[in-house]
Amino acid sequence: MQKSLATFFISPPEIPTQHGPDNILYDFNDGARVLLPEGKWHVRLLDADSGNILFCCDINNGWVTSSKKYFVRFRIQVFRQGEDSPLLDETLNLTDRDVLISFPTGTLGDLLGWFPYAERFQSLHQCRLECTMAQDIIDLLAPQYPQICFSTPEKPRTTEPYATYRVGLYFGGDTNNQPVDFRQVGFHRSAGYILGVDPREAPVRLNLSAPCTIREPYVCIATQSTCQAKYWNNGTGWSEVVAHLKSLGYRVLCIDREAHYGQGFVWNHIPWGAEDFTGSFPLQERVNLLRHASFFIGLASGLSWLAWATGIPVVLISGFSLPDSEFYTPWRVFNSHGCNGCWDDTSLNFDHKDFLWCPRHKNTDRQFECTRLITGTQVNGVISRLHASLMKQGDKACLTKGTNNEQGL
């Protein structure tokens, strides 16, 4: 069963959308762009904040574009050759302008991690912002952000934006689409750097108004992911965790989309003893279920981000990414005694087509040891401390409605 990895960005308009004097066209839809008619021109692209000249040239006609595509407060100057005063002098100003932020589609965790930076961007610049993303995520977020226009990449509403920014994961040491490699700052925080806003993380806003429909205390788990490196590859880990949760009095609900997932000869299955709540449900239904869970246990994947946004504690198990690669949770489970952190290694490039990607130890007995060495005992120890923290509050509601994720150990 192959998951869809459909993902694409909105391309810039074929010609710049802004009209300057003497038929000069310009915009900021792929960095700074200038299209010049026949003439003798001198063009400068500057960083307006530092005053540094980033590029200058003499040109008779054609295009001048910046190499940097992320947010820079560009200043475009176009002179007639030999003249001291610019004919066009435009400094990027997004206030009351049509701006597009293009996100990839099909990546729940990425979008939930990135989107708060788009809201921060709109609030800072007071622009007319449109964001493109997958429809199921639009359905989840749009009611909470009325000041932002949402659309799918196939049907953008803004056809002539003043500026466009493309938030995504850029590999291979790319510093034209991102000012700092996402693997050095955490993939979600890279959106803050691309958009030029405060990179501190924040959860998305969600509709948390649904009532609790399950009387017993319960914990939600999600065990599936998009590649084997993201799984918890300890053979008995999940079985030990489910048994421990039941001994503490919790129902254990598995809320993955698929009960079984894999490729080729490697398949992963719903843990024995967990209740099967799997299926392709609207994201809001998952929110309704998570909101009243005592806590959530999962991987470095989208449902962990969704659980975090509902405000419940998240036990996050990961080894292929470093502890600061995702949102902060005091209940992070990481084992430093083996190979780890390949996702965040800037000398490596993740291979999306290799389901068994393990760049340092593939086809050896050390393959996936980053999570294989995370034992059920280690995870159950974190669960026991979290459970004790909930019990210590002396509020029975904490067991059924959860508690804020920022509580310490």
Curated annotation (Swiss-Prot):
Highest taxon of the lineage: Bacteria
Predominant place of localization: cytoplasm
Catalytic reaction(s) noted: ADP-D-glycero-beta-D-manno-heptose + L-seryl-[protein] = O-(D-glycero-alpha-D-manno-heptosyl)-L-seryl-[protein] + ADP + H(+); ADP-L-glycero-beta-D-manno-heptose + L-seryl-[protein] = O-(L-glycero-alpha-D-manno-heptosyl)-L-seryl-[protein] + ADP + H(+)
Cofactor comment text: Binds 1 Fe(3+) cation per subunit.
Keywords from the named record: Cytoplasm, Glycosyltransferase, Iron, Metal-binding, Plasmid, Transferase
InterPro entries, A to Z: Aah/TibC-like (IPR030929), Glyco_trans_9 (IPR002201), TibC/BAHTCr-like_N (IPR049327)
Signal peptide: none
UniProt cofactor(s): Fe(3+)
Residues involved in ADP-D-glycero-beta-D-manno-heptose binding: 107-109, 224, 226, 230, 257, 302, 326
GO cellular component, one term: cytoplasm
Family annotation (NCBIfam families): hepto_Aah_TibC (TIGR04414)
Family: Belongs to the glycosyltransferase 9 family.
Function comment: Glycosylates autotransporter CARC. By glycosylating CARC, involved in the colonization of the mouse host gastrointestinal tract.
Subunit description: Homododecamer composed of 6 homodimers forming a ring.
The protein, known as: Autotransproter heptosyltransferase BAHTCr
Phylogenetic lineage: Bacteria, Pseudomonadati, Pseudomonadota, Gammaproteobacteria, Enterobacterales
